[in-house]
Curated annotation (Swiss-Prot):
Its cofactor is Mg(2+). It comes from the Bacteria. Belongs to the polyribonucleotide nucleotidyltransferase family. The gene is pnp. It is found in: Cytoplasm. It catalyses: RNA(n+1) + phosphate = RNA(n) + a ribonucleoside 5'-diphosphate. This is Polyribonucleotide nucleotidyltransferase. Mg(2+) binds at D506, D512. Residues 657-724 form the S1 motif domain. Residues 571-631 form the KH domain. Involved in mRNA degradation. Catalyzes the phosphorolysis of single-stranded polyribonucleotides processively in the 3'- to 5'-direction.
Amino acid sequence: MSKVCEFELNGKQEIFEFEKVAKQSNGAVLAKIGNAVVLATVVSEFDNPVSEDFTPLTVQYIEKTYAAAKLPGGFIKREGKPSDFETLTSRVIDRSLRPLFPKGYVYPTTITVMVLSADKNVDLQTLSLNAANAALYTSNLPIKKSVCGVRVGKIENTLVINPTNEQLENSTLDLYVAGSKEELLMIEMKTISSSELVEIDIEAFTKIHNTNEMDEDALVEAIAFAQNALKEANLTYEKAFEEVSKEKFEVELVKFTIEESVINYVRDNFSNDIKEAIKKLAKSERATQLKDVAKMISKNEYCISNEIEFNTIYEAVSVVKREIVRAMIVNERVRADGRGLKDVRPISIETNILPSTHSSCLFTRGETQALVIGTIAGPKDGQMYEVLTDKSTSMENFMVHYNFPGFSVGEAKPMFGVGRRELGHGNLAKKALEATIDKDYNETVRLVSEILESNGSSSMATVCGGSLALKAAGIPISDLVAGVAMGMVVENDKYAILTDIMGLEDHDGDMDFKVAGTSKGITALQMDIKLGGIELSVLKEALLQAKEGRTHILSLMKDAEKDIVPSGALPLIEQFAIDPSKIMVVIGKAGATIKEIIEKFTVSIDLDKENGTVKVSGGNKQNIIDACEHIKTISNNAPSKKDASKNIDFEKLYSEDEVVIGKVERLADFGAFILLPKGGEGLLHISKISKDRVKNVADVLSIGQELEVKVLKVKKDRIELSSAN
């Protein structure tokens, strides 16, 4: 018999139904809000432990198209490769719940979340995390803490918990926070630009929209607001789920420990060697330096006589290395590469180094290097994708694709498909940059970040290089965006905040968070906390220190901006407007006219039927000018709907057998409409164009062509013509 927990939380009725479906799993729940129904299951293989020191957790978030009464798009009518949203949501759930697993839990575990019914007013990402938490918390796994997620929006300067999708469209903030009733574990945040104009540059003919960057105080306030909501939600969940929770299975937590005597031997005799290796590690993410030290130690008489295995020695070296790195930072306030806690590594910037690309930027910070390439295309060239709750297909016109080849960290491995990490890093960079792009700019922009070297903070190098690549491509942005990766080391009651962390500090530190923004404030943030929580006062201190680093990087980027020389491959674009009623004339029958213009002048043309905007782009300036003039001529010679609807008395203007010179206005299957010199238009039927049989009007006539026509019949409201020849 099923067990149901029902309660109201943040103004929404939530229903969790247990022991109804998927009863073979360790934990399962049907979670419902409104018309949204999500199934979350947890399965752990207690009899199949792995032999490595990590938590073998896999999370899958799956959207079923039947949940929105739709069929899968495309040729194959079955769900296949996960969408970017599904992958990113899986990653969010993983990062939120992984800290709950106790150290030494080595049993393969899979959390599966399936959307069975969708509701456009329900945030599926938040519901799915909370459903996964419910399944995990009530399962027989040794998880004794509830972790849930909340989303915070800012609508008309008011913070809102778990806004609907419709409300989020009017929000200037998208903040997603996951945590327990005591601790914050994960934060993702981006600002959203609004249509509100803050400035109009008359000389540059540009409008600057409000990008809504957040200052540090406002962001901490929003996080505190979310933390209060998390506390309330987790207390509610823990109380509600207490009666339905299964008895916890007692599993063995494997301790991957090394004999203290080995660690002491390495620490007492080889600390200086390890320190030297640490200095080299500061220049690379490769682990070869530590292995060299371990090999040297393994040849020592002590290790040989005690038959100590190489892997044990290497693990002992890693333990001592971590101790040294953390002690240097916390006690000596110096880092492995000699930097102070607030110092940023040396930066070099080059723009437009690839002559055949629209734009490019090589951004190097220490041993991290990103080559970011920008490409511009038309509005219709974006990435089409489906949103589960939308009936129509959506278009993504700004893309950031992040690639992390093995050679960037000295690994000999081939390049395959995009992984979750690469999708996540690209998505973070996109969040940081998209708010600064002019909302009226509707071209498609693709940034590709090729990480050529990596020693920490490659996603933030992508942000910096991406912002300059946008600038180098002439794309209207409100300001440059810089990003910096921050870290923290905590030892007892001491802590140290690090600016621009490298791979070594990321691995041995207690917190990794990335902050991106302009000179006005923060546009995006991502934080993962390894130490089990952070005080808001410490978080604010870290944000202010990040601001110092960001300001320094922005000053160097602005210097590099002055040296930008536009690429010769950059597409030339001319834009003008015509009467919207004449757009169809420019298009012609079945697109014949516009195809002819495109082929004749070797250009691309985008037309907006609603406002009459015409955009012509191409590689040859004269061709673009000629194409624009040609389109304007067609438009000027075509009557508007207003003119065509005038009540013209043809009997007063024309007489039968009269020959006049007219101009082809538009083509139809049955003939051509001819603009007459005294006003109005007449029909030249396909049978009257020539003595020879005409199969296709467009084969013998074209828009704008002048020809002699003879008046056959005249009536008060219409006139019939034939070719005078």
